[in-house]
Amino acid sequence: MKVILISGKAQNGKDTVAAYMREKLTEDRHRVLITHYADLLKYICRSYFGWNGVKDENGRKMLQYVGTDVIRKANPSLWVDFVALMLKYFHENWDYVIIPDCRFPHEVSTMRESGFDT
């Protein structure tokens, strides 16, 4: 399994690039997953804090507070460790995994240290 990490500024097309890559790779019959380090954060905010999924000013504040001020302060690598663990468990399900929200150097190094071809 190859892991493709995409980094860039907010609202600059990272998810669009990931979707295009998935389209082209699946045309060649590759199994492709797009996932985000922030998927677990969004799930937590929806399930535990009633977030409606809208990234308006209040939504962004909630995501930042829970993701950075609480979780990242307690465990800076929780988000990337969770994704790496899930990919280890289910590595046979995909040929490519695309992660379009890579922001920090440890997100790259954790994937490499976990043995993924990045």
Residue ranges of predicted features:
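Extreme N-terminal starter segment of soluble prokaryotic enzymes
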Residues: 1-4
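P-loop (Walker A) phosphate-binding loop of NTP-binding proteins
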Residues: 8-9
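Conserved lysine of the Walker
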Residues: 14
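Hydrophobic positions on the alpha1 helix immediately C-terminal to the Walker A/P-loop
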Residues: 17
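Active-site signature of alpha/beta-hydrolase-fold catalytic machinery across serine-
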Residues: 20
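ATP-dependent small-molecule kinase phosphotransfer cores
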Residues: 30-95
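Surface-exposed amphipathic alpha-helices with a cationic face
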Residues: 88-91, 108-113
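Conserved phosphate-donor/acceptor-positioning beta-strand/loop module used by diverse small-molecule
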Residues: 96-103, 110-118
